[in-house]
Amino acid sequence: MLSPRRTKFRKQQRGRMEGLAHRGSTLNFGDFALQAQEPAWITSRQIEASRRAMTRYIRRGGQIWIRIFPDKPVTMRPAETRMGSGKGNPEFWVAVVKPGRILFEIAGVSEEVAREAMRLAAYKLPIKTKFIVRPQVQEQE
């Protein structure tokens, strides 16, 4: 599972997910992509489950790029703990995703295979997503 090797600070504030994604919203590496339609925190486990579903489906052919990285620690307090006495310990890592962000890219496979692989990956994610095709690829077919 993905997580940072080291961070400057152990804990972060939650923040807000307002507006659209400007960075990471264009297709850069592959020919097909999965784009987020809603804001969400995507955990490293969800990213890994999606990656496994895609790689299992496309087998040897093609290449996958993961365009998001879980760099935000989410803290939790132990169950049945009284209020106060500080913030909890980091439990897992999330990637903050805004609408329009490209999540995964695929190249080296046909559109049908890519579409099905992305559909399997999208099932593992807690948000609505959209399948995107690079414009040059559409013209060739």
UniProtKB/Swiss-Prot annotation:
One of the Pfam families matching this protein, by short name = Ribosomal_L16
What GO CC annotations are associated with the protein? cytosolic large ribosomal subunit
Superkingdom field: Bacteria
Keyword Repeat attached: no
Per the UniProt entry, what is one GO biological process?
A: translation
**GO molecular-function annotation terms?**
rRNA binding; structural constituent of ribosome; tRNA binding
Alphabetical UniProt keywords: Ribonucleoprotein, Ribosomal protein, RNA-binding, rRNA-binding, tRNA-binding
Which CDD domains does the record cross-reference, listed alphabetically? Ribosomal_L16_L10e (cd01433)
**Keyword Oxidoreductase attached:** no
Name the job this protein performs. Answer: Binds 23S rRNA and is also seen to make contacts with the A and possibly P site tRNAs.
- Family annotation (NCBIfam families): rplP_bact
Question: What does the subunit comment say?
Answer: Part of the 50S ribosomal subunit.
Q: Which family does it belong to?
A: Belongs to the universal ribosomal protein uL16 family.
Name the record gives this protein: Large ribosomal subunit protein uL16
Tell me the organism. Answer: Microchaete diplosiphon (Fremyella diplosiphon)
Which gene carries the instructions for this protein? rplP
